[in-house]
C-alpha cells in the first residue's frame, strides 16, 4: 500500500467472516487468503479514506471531509445470507455480489467527532464466480467489490452511465493505489 497514510485518521472496523473452509482449495495464492484477515481490511479502508480525503477532486459531504475518525462494518457472507438481505432491503430476489447500507445521510452529523459510515456485505460465492468469469483472482474481485461498497457508504451513486463510469474509474484508482 503505497499511499502515505495520514496518521491522524482513526478507523474502527468491525469485520466478520463466515467459515468458508470449503473454498480453501480455490484460494491457492497467499494474497487471496488476506481477504479473511481483519487487519488486511483495516489497512485497505484506512488507505482508501486517506486517498479520498487528500484528493480534492472528489466531492464529499462536509460531515465526511472534515472528520478524522470513522467506523464501518464489513461482512463476508454466503449467497443465502446476501439473498435474504437483498430481498428484505432491496426487494430483489436472489443473491447479489455486494450490498452497502450507509448510515450517514444528514448534515446534522457536522457536530459529531466520529462518523459511522455503515456496513458492507459481500457474498464470497458470488465473488468467486465473478473472479472466474472475469479471469482474475478472488483477491482482485473482493477488493473491487469492497471499493464499490465503500464508495456507496461515502455517498456515491450510479443512477446514470456517467455516474457509473466515474464511480468505476474511482474504484480502479483506489485499487491501483494498494499495489
UniProtKB/Swiss-Prot annotation:
Cofactor or coenzyme needed: Zn(2+)
SUPFAM superfamilies in alphabetical order: Metalloproteases ('zincins'), catalytic domain
Presence of keyword Mitochondrion: no
Record keywords, A-Z: Cytoplasm, Endonuclease, Hydrolase, Metal-binding, Nuclease, Ribosome biogenesis, rRNA processing, Zinc
Cellular component, GO annotation: cytoplasm
Cofactor binding description: Binds 1 zinc ion.
Lineage: superkingdom: Bacteria
Annotated compartments: Cytoplasm
EC category: hydrolase
MF-aspect GO terms: metalloendopeptidase activity; RNA endonuclease activity; zinc ion binding
Chain positions recorded as Zn(2+) binding sites: 148, 152, 158
One protein family per Pfam: YbeY
Main location (coarse class): cytoplasm
Spans traversing the lipid bilayer: none
Assigned protein family: Belongs to the endoribonuclease YbeY family.
PANTHER family given in the database record: ENDORIBONUCLEASE YBEY, CHLOROPLASTIC
Function: Single strand-specific metallo-endoribonuclease involved in late-stage 70S ribosome quality control and in maturation of the 3' terminus of the 16S rRNA.
Entry protein name: Endoribonuclease YbeY
Amino acid at each position: 500500500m503505497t499511499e502515505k497514510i495520514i496518521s491522524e485518521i482513526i478507523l474502527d472496523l468491525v469485520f466478520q467472516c463466515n467459515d468458508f473452509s470449503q473454498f480453501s482449495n480455490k484460494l491457492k495464492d497467499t494474497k487471496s487468503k488476506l481477504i479473511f484477515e481483519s487487519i488486511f481490511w483495516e489497512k485497505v479502508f484506512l488507505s482508501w479514506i486517506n486517498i479520498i480525503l487528500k484528493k480534492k477532486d472528489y466531492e464529499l459531504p462536509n460531515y465526511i471531509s472534515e472528520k478524522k475518525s470513522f467506523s464501518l462494518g464489513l461482512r463476508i457472507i454466503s449467497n443465502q445470507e446476501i439473498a435474504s438481505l437483498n430481498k428484505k432491503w432491496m426487494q430483489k430476489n436472489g443473491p447479489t455480489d455486494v450490498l452497502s447500507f450507509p448510515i450517514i445521510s444528514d448534515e446534522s452529523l457536522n457536530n459529531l467527532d466520529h462518523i459511522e459510515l455503515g456496513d458492507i456485505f459481500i457474498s464470497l460465492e458470488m465473488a468467486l464466480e465473478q473472479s472466474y468469469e472475469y479471469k482474475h483472482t478472488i483477491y482482485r474481485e473482493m477488493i473491487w467489490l469492497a471499493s464499490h461498497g465503500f464508495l456507496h457508504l461515502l455517498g456515491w451513486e450510479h443512477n446514470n452511465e456517467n455516474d457509473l463510469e466515474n464511480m468505476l474509474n474511482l474504484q480502479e484508482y483506489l485499487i491501483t493505489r494498494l499495489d
